[in-house]
Design a protein with these regions (language model features):
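Bacterial N-terminal signal peptides that target proteins for export
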Residues: 1-11
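Cleavable N-terminal signal peptides
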Residues: 10, 20-21
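Acidic Gly/Asp/Thr-rich repetitive segments characteristic of extracellular carbohydrate-active
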Residues: 22-61, 88, 414, 432, ...
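Short catalytic/signature loops enriched in Gly
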Residues: 399-422
Length: 468
C-alpha cells in the first residue's frame, strides 16, 4: 500500500557513535556555525550551545552525509538554542542526509519569493528536522517550513502558536507540476493555530492546484492536532497517492480536506470535536476512521468540474470514493453533501459497512450521488435526512461502549460483529491498528477484540520534542 520506514541497527549505532565522537564541534556564534557547516563531512556532529542567535542571513547547508553517517546539527539542549531574526536554515539542492535537531525557531516566517522560514530546497534529499520547536514570528503572512526536496523526515517537532496567514508546513516540488517525493511527517504536535482570516492557512498542505495530479507518496502518521483552525482546511491535500493514518484531531480543529488529487488513503484516524473529513477527486479510500462529537463527520464534496477536462482549481467531482468501516458517533452532521449551485454532485461512491449513531442529522445529502452504492451500514438514532438512502442502513443498536481511554468500542453481541459485507481486501486493520479478518469483518471502525489496542487517541506526552 505504501512504503515502510524503519531505522536499521546500523543507523542507530552510527547515531550513537556520532553523539560521542571526538569529531563533535561546539559553536557559540552564527559565524562559527556557518564555518563548521562549510567544512562538515559525513558523520560530523555540530553542537550549537544554548543561547539566542539573531540571523540576518540564511544558515546555508549544501553538505552531504550518508545514510549511516548523517551530518547532524543540533542544539546543546532541546529548545536551548534559539534562532531568531530574519531567517533560519536553508538546505540547498546539494544537501543530503542532514539532520537539524533540537532548535527553537522564532525567526521570521517565510514568503516564497522573499525567503525566510525554514526551507528544504528542490534537489535536497534525505534531510530531517527532529525535536525542534517552531514558533516563528510574522506580522502579516508566511510559512513555518517549506519542503521541496525528496525523502524528507519531519518528526517529534512542535508547530505552535501561529496567528498569521501562511501554512505551518507547505510541500512543493522541483517544478511547477511535480511534487517532492516520500515526505514522512510523524510524531509531531500541531497546536494553537486560530483563524487567520485568509486562505493558505493549513497546518499541513501537500501540493498546490498546479501540482494536484502529480503523486507525492507522502505519509502523515501519528501526529496530534489541537485547536488548529487557521482556515477551514486543517490539512489540505492537493496531490496524489498520499496516506494519512493514526493521527488524532481534536478540540475544534478544522477539516482534513482532500481538496485536490487522486488515490489518497485515510485510515485509522481519530476525529474528536472537529470538522471531520471532506473529499474531492477520484478513487480515494476512507476506512477505519473514528468520528465523535464533530460538527461534520464525513463530507462528500459537491463538485463543480471534472478534472482534467476542467481547470485544476475546480472542485473535482468525487468519483470512485470508497467510504467503508468508519464509526461516526454523536456528530451534528454525520454524513453530508452541501448543496452547490449547478453542482455536479458525486458519482460511483461506495458507502458500506459504516456505523452511524446518535447526533442531529445522520444523513444530509443535498446533491446527486449517481451510480453509487449505500449498503449494509448500521444506523442508530433519529432518521433525519435518511430518505432515499434508508435501504442502505440497518436500523439497530450497534452496542457501543466507551472504554477507559475514551473511545467507543463494540461490545459482545453487537450486531456489527462478523456482519460486514464482502470485499475490501485492502482493509487490513481497524482503528486500533489490530488486524481484521480476511473474510468476516465487523461493521464500523472497530474490530471486536479483547486485546489492548495498539493505536489510541494520542496524548501530548506521546508526541513532540520531549516525547520518548
Amino acid at each position: 500500500m505504501h512504503f515502510t520506514r524503519k531505522l536499521s541497527l546500523a543507523v542507530i549505532l552510527s547515531t550513537v557513535a556520532a553523539a560521542v565522537s571526538a569529531a563533535d564541534i561546539k559553536v557559540s556564534s552564527l559565524d562559527e556555525l556557518q564555518t563548521a557547516i562549510n567544512s562538515a563531512t559525513p558523520g560530523a556532529h555540530i553542537i550549537v550551545v544554548d543561547g539566542v542567535y539573531d540571523a540576518t542571513n540564511p544558515i546555508v547547508i549544501s553538505q552531504k552525509g550518508t545514510a549511516h553517517k548523517p551530518v547532524v546539527i543540533s542544539a546543546e539542549n532541546i529548545g536551548g538554542a534559539e534562532i531568531s531574526g530574519a531567517i533560519g536554515f536553508l538546505l540547498k539542492s546539494n544537501a543530503a542526509y542532514v539532520t537539524i535537531e533540537g532548535f527553537k525557531f522564532t525567526h521570521a516566517t517565510g514568503i516564497e519569493e522573499h525567503g525566510g522560514g525554514e526551507m528544504i530546497g528542490a534537489g535536497a534529499s534525505h534531510c530531517r528536522y527532529t525535536r525542534n520547536i517552531f514558533e516563528l514570528s510574522g506580522k502579516s503572512r508566511g510559512y513555518y517550513l517549506m519542503i521541496s526536496g525528496d525523502d524528507t523526515e519531519i518528526d517529534h517537532n512542535s508547530f505552535q502558536n501561529k496567528f498569521t496567514i501562511g501554512q505551518m508546513i507547505i510541500i512543493h516540488g522541483p517544478s511547477t507540476n511535480l511534487m517532492a517525493q516520500r515526505t514522512w511527517i510523524h510524531q509531531n504536535i500541531f497546536t494553537n493555530f486560530p483563524d487567520a482570516h485568509g486562505n493558505n492557512c493549513s497546518s499541513i498542505q501537500i501540493g498546490v492546484s498546479g501540482r494536484s495530479l502529480s503523486p507525492a507518496h507522502a505519509l502523515v502518521e501519528n501526529n496530534l492536532f489541537i485547536r488548529c483552525r487557521g482556515e477551514n482546511e486543517n490539512i489540505c491535500n492537493k496531490s496524489c497517492d498520499n496516506i494519512y493514518r493514526f493521527n488524532t484531531f481534536e478540540d475544534n480543529c478544522s477539516e482534513l480536506s482532500l481538496r485536490h488529487g487522486d488515490r489518497n488513503i485515510v485510515y485509522a484516524n481519530f476525529f474528536l470535536g472537529t470538522d471531520g473529513l471532506r473529499m474531492f477527486g477520484k478513487n480515494d479510500k476512507i476506512f477505519s476512521n473514528y468520528f465523535e462529537d464533530c460538527h461534520r463527520g464525513i463530507h462528500i464534496g459537491n463538485g463543480d468540474g471534472v478534472v482534467p477536462a476542467s481547470k485544476l482549481t475546480s472542485h473535482d467531482r468525487p468519483d470512485g470514493m470508497q467510504i467503508a468501516f468508519n464509526t461516526i458517533v454523536n456528530c451534528t452532521n454525520s454524513v453530508m453533501m452541501l448543496a452547490r449551485r449547478n453542482g455536479l454532485g458525486a458519482t460511483n461512491i461506495i458507502f458500506k459497512n459504516n456505523i452511524v449513531a446518535g447526533g442531529k442529522n445522520l444523513v444530509a445529502i443535498e446533491g446527486a450521488m449517481t451510480h453509487s452504492v449505500v449498503k449494509n451500514n448500521l444506523f442508530w438514532g433519529n432518521t433525519n435526512g435518511v430518505g432515499e438512502y434508508a435501504s442502505g442502513f440497518i436500523f439497530e443498536d450497534p452496542k457501543l461502549k466507551r472504554d477507559a481511554n475514551g473511545e467507543f468500542h463494540l461490545q459482545k453481541r453487537s450486531p456489527a460483529i462478523n456482519h460486514a459485507s464482502g470485499g475490501f481486501s485492502y482493509v487490513k486493520v481497524d482503528m486500533d491498528d489490530q488486524k481484521r479478518g480476511w473474510w468476516k469483518k465487523d461493521i464500523g471502525a472497530d474490530e471486536f477484540s479483547t486485546k489492548i489496542p495498539k493505536n489510541r487517541i494520542l496524548t501530548v506526552a506521546e508526541v513532540g520534542p520531549f516525547a520518548p
